[in-house]
Design a protein with these regions (language model features):
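Solvent-exposed loop/turn segments at secondary-structure junctions
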Residues: 35-38, 60-61, 68-71, 152-154, ...
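Sec/Tat-exported extracytoplasmic proteins
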Residues: 15-22, 27, 31-38, 50, ...
């Protein structure tokens, strides 16, 4: 089967091969490594496991990108005294908690509540999960894995499908971000089937060190962007880094809880208006092209998705497509919007 643009029959066939049980199985496999926090042996074991799975799916040309994570120590944060008054007003005159500025240039409407990640091992009530995550991270060498479906007619060009495989928080990092990692791996399974060909190359990249500041994705961009479109060895027809046509990130895909209620609590149930949010960054060099890419994904979701509508927003931020957004059209798929 040759997958070409506008070939609705081939697309429908590939969509039908998406398998919920396969997706859940990959997520379950990732949870055996706890939160997969960077700088730990559980993280490195997860990278090894991901590579083995990609090879088993037929994406056998796996590669590792190596880099070093050794940041300067952060200065201690000044803690606000309980007696100091807190300014909760926003530029519109309302109080924080009702309205205010949000990430990626967004505005927040409705109620807000404080969020954060648990770093206290003993705050995790499950003893098994505590033991999985007992090892603390250390700075030093890191690796992340990717593989490539080689295009038949345009092997020198590619789209990058990415997700970060690391997490943190003394948990199993299921939503953030086994959910995105498993989706990219499920796509790798389908698109690397022996009966599937694509005109353009597709790279499946599982980033590391997202939770520490997108370090794995930034390292990829720094190391690989100047290699785009170069045939190596000359005359071989091989392109170790095909020219980037677009970058599509998958980060937190599992459930849409919506905004907190008046009591500041977030519902444990998915909201009735749950959707897929496709984001680009309006303050990026490729904003217009990224917006067009986002709406192409929305059109595809409208045509082939069976459960959830898709919406497009301009506030992409804090995810691994950010390092790419001034190099190539880039979008992020996620469970909920950054803000209005």
């Amino acid at each position: 089967m040759m997958l070409q643009a506008q070939d609705n029959g081939a697309i429908k066939e590939l969509v039908s091969r998406l398998d919920l049980e396969s997706y859940k199985s990959i997520i379950k496999g990732l949870t055996q490594f706890g939160d997969r926090r960077q700088g730990t042996s559980r993280n490195q074991k997860a990278v090894d496991w991901i590579e083995q799975q990609l090879q088993a799916f037929g994406c056998s040309n796996t590669k590792r990108l190596a880099y070093t994570y050794d940041p300067e120590p952060r200065p201690p944060r000044r803690r606000q005294s309980a007696s100091e008054p807190t300014d909760l007003t926003t530029p519109t005159g309302g109080n924080v908690g009702r309205n205010g500025s949000g990430p990626g240039g967004s505005s927040i409407f409705g109620y807000r509540s404080q969020t954060g990640v648990n770093r206290d091992l003993m705050a995790q009530p499950d003893e098994r999960i505590r033991e999985l995550n007992r090892e603390e991270p250390t700075n030093g060498p890191r690796t992340e894995v990717y593989c490539t479906k080689i295009g038949t007619t345009r092997p020198h060009e590619m789209y990058i499908l990415g997700a970060h495989m690391d997490g943190h928080g003394v948990n199993e990092a299921v939503n953030d971000n086994a959910s995105g990692t498993a989706l990219v791996m499920e796509l790798a399974r389908i698109l690397n089937s022996s009966d599937v060909e694509t005109e353009i190359s597709i790279r499946f990249a599982l980033w590391n060190n997202e939770e520490t500041g997108l370090n794995g994705a930034y390292s990829y961009v720094r190391q690989r962007k100047e290699l785009q479109g170069i045939e190596n060895p000359p005359g071989s027809g091989e392109y170790p880094e095909p020219t980037w046509l677009g970058m599509i990130q998958h980060d937190m895909m599992l459930w849409d809880h919506g905004a907190p209620g008046p009591d500041g609590k977030v519902s444990r149930d998915q909201r009735r208006e749950a959707d897929i949010n496709i984001e680009f960054q309006s303050n990026s060099y490729f904003a217009e092209a990224s917006m067009k890419l986002a709406f192409r994904f929305k059109a595809a979701a409208d045509a082939y998705n069976t459960d959830f509508p898709a919406t497009v927003g301009p506030h992409m931020t804090n995810t691994d497509s950010t390092p790419f957004m001034n190099e190539v059209p880039s979008i992020s798929l996620r469970e909920n919007e950054r803000g209005a």
